[in-house]
Amino acid sequence: MTILNRFCRTILLTNLELTNCGIRKNNSYKCRSFTHTINIDTNHIVPIHTQSNITLELFQPKISVVGVGGGGGNAVNHMISQSLEGVEFFVCNTDSQDLIKSNSINKIQLGPQLTKGHGAGANPEKGRLAAEESKNKIIQTFKDTDLLFLAAGMGGGTGTGSSPIIAKTIKEFKKETIIVGVVTVPFNFEGKRKEIIAKKGLEELSKYVDTLVVISNQNLLDASKSDIQLEQAFLMVDEILHTGIRSIANIINVPGMINLDYSDVVNILKNRKGLSRIGFGEASGEDRAYKAVHKAIKNPLIEIDDQKFTGLLVNISGGNDITLNEISKTINYLQQNADPDVQVFVGHTVDNSLLGKIRISCLFVH
């Protein structure tokens, strides 16, 4: 029986409730707040229903998602359609027609004087100048945000040129804001010019975000069926962006057996250098925990073989049929496959739409 398993069962036997464990360096654990416990007969996770006369003031971070440019706007539309809870959505674009079509109610037209609403014409410099023109609007919109996810497609004009200025502007106004860039880089068929523009955009954006997660469209295409339609390919990209942002937001917002403090999430996201990757895995049936975590860390999208990662943020999602033993197995597997110096933080969220399944997401950060 693992340390975590023994520890949890000891807590149960003394009628204490467990919800919050974070794996720390050297395999030490810490626990804090309590909202779920284990049904000893079934070994399943169940919510705790308690009454208390104590009034607590809880810090609820404001989480925002902003889609910049056409690609970022499409990603936000997809997230809104999937009912991602606990976050507020925004779109920023130079193209007024794209803004009109957006499902988000919070819209910023970038550089209206410069572009007259006609877009940046695939020119990152015009995108940069448009964002510079709209700095005051950007500050006013995001001044109260604590955690910002910035979604964009690299290789065009607005997403590539405006995103770094948006991130820089917010950081200069409120340095405590944690900014996570979640961006895509082009398919090979989009040409060398877009590839070069995207690379320069990544370099510039990485200066101003805390964590930069990069998703390769080409890797996604290579890992999918060869006859996939273009529309399906871009929808898959939007779903990857959605899943990545949801996994981090849910660790903070959704109750579960293991709820990380916001400070833990900040610790692993803040001031990271280099490009980060995210992997996902979902499985059902026998050995579903092992299968899901194996898929997540061996995901072809994340390209981690030649990179040194210093942190790993993991979200384990499942219905109330998920067992403590499955969570323990997942944590053990991650420990065995991670460098001893890597900080590993694990959160668990309950999602009863996943009854019979386990979904695991892993954010690898520098």
From Swiss-Prot:
One of its GO terms (biological process) is cell division. The keyword Iron-sulfur does not apply. Its main location: mitochondrion. It holds the Pfam family Tubulin. GO terms for cellular component: cell division site; cytoplasm; mitochondrial matrix. GTP binds at G70, G71, G72, G73, N74, G157, T158, G159, E190, D238. Keywords: GTP-binding, Mitochondrion, Nucleotide-binding. GO terms for molecular function: GTP binding; GTPase activity. It is found in: Mitochondrion. It comes from the Eukaryota. Belongs to the FtsZ family. Probably involved in mitochondrion division process. Binds to and hydrolyzes GTP. NCBIfam families: ftsZ. PANTHER family: CELL DIVISION PROTEIN FTSZ-RELATED, MITOCHONDRIAL DIVISION PROTEIN FSZB. This is Mitochondrial division protein fszB. It comes from Dictyostelium discoideum. The lineage of its organism: Eukaryota, Amoebozoa, Evosea, Eumycetozoa, Dictyostelia. The gene is fszB.
